[in-house]
Amino acid sequence: MAIFSVYVVNKAGGLIYQLDSYAPRAEAEKTFSYPLDLLLKLHDERVLVAFGQRDGIRVGHAVLAINGVDVNGKYTADGKEVLEYLGNPANYPVSIRFGRPRLTSNEKLMLASMFHSLFAIGSQLSPEQGSSGIEMLETDTFKLHCFQTLTGIKFVVLADPRQAGIDSLLRKIYEIYSDFALKNPFYSLEMPIRCELFDQNLKLALEVAEKAGTFGPGS
């Protein structure tokens, strides 16, 4: 069981909080000698495989780590430029980990805005008045669950399809938001949530839900 991500979207469709609670699965990790037999290119500030699909490495996969050091965009965590580093024969042999590209901050903002629009469309298309909008979307690999408050704040959780008790978890997150964001004198409504106690209690709630496989009353 797993809870993948949490999003909080304000009533205008702006993303005010986002948390990824899992490490993306690496599709492939391989040690290479020089010259590299893959064609890599820079796209949207990420280093992607453009040609040379093999051994589980696919076109479109991003470079996630080099020699165990995480890659953020086009740089490693220790400040090395990825394409420049891989173009130097002195750095070989080199171990490269590949996987699906991680979403950038801008992409997350855009997706939150798109979901806000889809939510509104769903409410308008309903044959019944007072529709609650989108509450759940299901795919083969995850389910998206949404809870909208009376004030228009949306709490969105992406979870494993087998994860139970998400409705209770969404209300628990709302409770944490009320206790540790709204009651924080330094927090302004509709603005990004940057409250340490909110972070801590949200992560604790996710851990409890994942370990139990559910999140029932009294948790």
Curated annotation (Swiss-Prot):
Q: Which GO terms describe its cellular component?
A: dendrite; endoplasmic reticulum; Golgi membrane; Golgi stack; postsynaptic density membrane; presynaptic active zone; synaptic vesicle; TRAPP complex
UniProt xrefs under Pfam families: Sybindin
Q: Which CDD domains match?
A: TRAPPC4_synbindin
Record GO biological process = autophagy; dendrite development; endoplasmic reticulum to Golgi vesicle-mediated transport
Cellular localisation: Postsynaptic cell membrane; Golgi apparatus membrane; Endoplasmic reticulum; Vesicle
Q: Does the keyword Ion transport apply?
A: no
Q: What does this protein do?
A: Core component of the TRAPP complexes which has a function of guanine nucleotide exchange factor activity for Rab1 GTPase. Plays a role in vesicular transport from endoplasmic reticulum to Golgi and autophagy. May play a role in dendrite postsynaptic membrane trafficking.
What quaternary arrangement does the UniProt entry report? Component of the multisubunit TRAPP (transport protein particle) complex, which includes at least TRAPPC2, TRAPPC2L, TRAPPC3, TRAPPC3L, TRAPPC4, TRAPPC5, TRAPPC8, TRAPPC9, TRAPPC10, TRAPPC11 and TRAPPC12. Interacts with SDC2.
Family per UniProt? Answer: Belongs to the TRAPP small subunits family. TRAPPC4 subfamily.
**What is the protein name given in its UniProt record?**
Trafficking protein particle complex subunit 4
| Annotated source species | Bos taurus
Gene name linked to the record:
TRAPPC4
